[in-house]
């Protein structure tokens, strides 16, 4: 049996990335206990691993962009084009399939169905009542959400709201709190509470249109919860309770007492970049695309997706793949013109006196030169031997 120290020194000498070295070392230690390897066997395993690793590297000149585009694009043709309910939660809609992939690669500022998955800390995650406490802190509640009926009394110039007692109790608010919050936010009106009825009277408004406008603002006013977050759903996953939110406010959710900030996540990639940085956003892009494809029963090698995520986050900000992002920033005039809005690109380039270095694939195809891909990247010059002198 080989000593762990010897295995460590042999693995360290191998020409492999650190993460593979670590995994290889752990596996060798595990199997060494079981099979009691000789030193020569350990060396043979390491040698075979290095050989396999080198065989798996991309060949110089491989058109990895084209391969990635094919590998992601082909399975995408089999994806759904609809927005579906979240798995097991009928109340929350989430964009799946091709629309979600397009949303990610277009780097849209606001996803069409923003969602946060909120994990709870040790104290709150195993008890539904405690999870409900946290959900109440998060859930955005407006007067409209609590109302059973709303009406405008034209004769008395009043806005009357009948509150649903059940919804009120569920929200953790009471009539007095609602009155105080509205009074502090709307100085131009008086608020009166009568049982479960709230009456608003404007102080100065004389037109019916002004009363309608004010009543719209009052009913949409946020009474509690995080801005940007609508309803919340609590689901049991394994032993713990997890909260799903409709809407996203990643910066604020991490500060809410009872939330586990190390595991909580959002599907808004721009929020992740802003709060956790560009590396976290890159990981989120990879994970979102992989999960979206996996939900449709499609498997794509993660390295193709990693390449897309790397290109999108290379400059430290999230760039879309398109004329407003990566393609629009290409150094080649002809490549930009070949993609979209051809004449505009050519006119602007002529105006600035730009030159094209002809380093890429598209521009060389356009002018009929060999493409710098595969054998096209190799430049050979033959050194002919001198003819021997005649005797």
From Swiss-Prot:
Catalytic activity: RNA(n) + a ribonucleoside 5'-triphosphate = RNA(n+1) + diphosphate
Keyword entries, A-Z: Cytoplasm, DNA-binding, DNA-directed RNA polymerase, Nucleotidyltransferase, Transcription, Transferase
GO cellular component: cytoplasm; DNA-directed RNA polymerase complex
Enzyme class: transferase
Lineage top rank: taxon: Archaea
Family: Belongs to the RNA polymerase beta' chain family.
Description of how the protein assembles with itself and partners: Part of the RNA polymerase complex.
Name under which the protein is recorded: DNA-directed RNA polymerase subunit Rpo1C
């Amino acid at each position: 049996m080989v000593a762990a120290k010897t295995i460590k020194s042999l693995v360290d000498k191998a020409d492999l990335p650190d993460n593979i070295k670590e995994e290889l070392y752990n596996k060798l230690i595990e199997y060494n206990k079981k099979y009691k390897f000789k030193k020569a066997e350990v060396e043979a395993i390491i040698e075979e691993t290095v050989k396999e690793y080198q065989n798996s590297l991309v060949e110089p000149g491989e058109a990895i962009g084209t391969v990635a585009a094919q590998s992601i694009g082909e399975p995408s043709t089999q994806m759904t084009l609809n927005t579906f309910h979240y798995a097991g939660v009928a109340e929350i809609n989430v964009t799946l399939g091709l629309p979600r992939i397009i949303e990610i690669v277009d780097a849209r500022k606001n996803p069409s169905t923003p969602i946060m998955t909120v994990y709870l800390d040790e104290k709150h995650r195993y008890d539904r009542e405690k999870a409900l406490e946290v959900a109440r802190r998060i859930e955005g509640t407006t007067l409209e959400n609590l109302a059973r009926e709303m009406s405008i009394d034209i004769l008395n110039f009043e806005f009357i709201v009948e509150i649903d007692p059940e919804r009120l109790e569920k929200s953790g608010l009471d009539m007095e709190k609602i009155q105080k919050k509205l009074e502090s936010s709307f100085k131009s009106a008086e608020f009166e509470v009568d049982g479960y009825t709230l009456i608003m009277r404007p102080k100065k408004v004389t037109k019916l249109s002004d009363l309608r406008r004010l009543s719209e603002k009052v009913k949409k006013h946020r009474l509690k919860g995080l801005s940007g977050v609508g309803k919340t759903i609590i689901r049991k996953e394994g032993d713990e309770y997890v909260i799903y939110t409709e809407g996203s406010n990643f910066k604020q959710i991490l500060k809410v007492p009872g939330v586990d900030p190390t595991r909580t996540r959002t599907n808004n990639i721009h929020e992740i970049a802003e709060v956790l940085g560009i590396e976290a956003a890159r990981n989120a892009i990879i994970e979102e695309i992989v999960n979206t494809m996996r939900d449709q029963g499609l498997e794509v090698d993660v390295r193709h997706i990693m390449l897309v995520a790397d290109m999108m986050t290379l400059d430290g900000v999230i760039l879309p793949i398109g004329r407003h992002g990566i393609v629009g920033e290409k150094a080649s005039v002809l490549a930009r013109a070949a993609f979209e809005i051809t004449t505009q690109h050519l006119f602007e380039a002529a105006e600035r006196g730009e030159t094209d270095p002809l380093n890429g694939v598209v521009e060389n195809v356009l002018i009929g030169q060999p493409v710098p891909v595969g054998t096209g990247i190799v430049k050979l010059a033959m050194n002919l031997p001198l003819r021997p002198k005649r005797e």
